[in-house]
Amino acid sequence: MKRNLKIAGVLALISVICALAIAGMNMVTSGIIKANTEKTELKTCQAIFSSYDKDKSEEMTSSNEAITKKVLAKDSNGNELGYLYTVTGKNAYGAITIMVAVKDDKVLQVEFLENGQSFASTVTSHVQNSYPSSPDDSVHVGAYKKEEASNIGSLSSSEIDGIDTACGATYGAKLVKELVNIALQDAKGGK
């Protein structure tokens, strides 16, 4: 009996030490991760709208919980450039966070901020071939780089509905389409 209690005590001590180590590491890295995320978002905003001014732009609220951030993008003179949506969704294959630029009820550009899908490279290729996307490889997070610049113009709601999601990662492609539609519908005022 004493032996079992001793083993249980040692295991409890090990688990407490591990928990403290994990919590400490989280405290050290959480600020760095947040700063890197903000830097990536700013870089993406500036890639979409080259004259984007973070200080003049207005962060807005949205009732849709998939929209994690909504910004009315403005230039340094306060002129409106369009809306920037950070939209997040998840399915059985992982999470996707994209930034969607909308102006005049059309999608101007779609960029990945996070692509955690199990077939991430296929989803990335599909998005780059189906939606307006940046030719700048550095905007895309992760190891998946665009092979050729997309010349797709802005897309209306009906054009987005017509995008074929059958690819090597159909569930990821459907999730991206759903997220783009969420942003577009919010920009249209839920119409």
Regions found by a protein language model. Name each.
Residues K2-K191:
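Flexible, solvent-exposed loop/hinge segments and secondary-structure transition points
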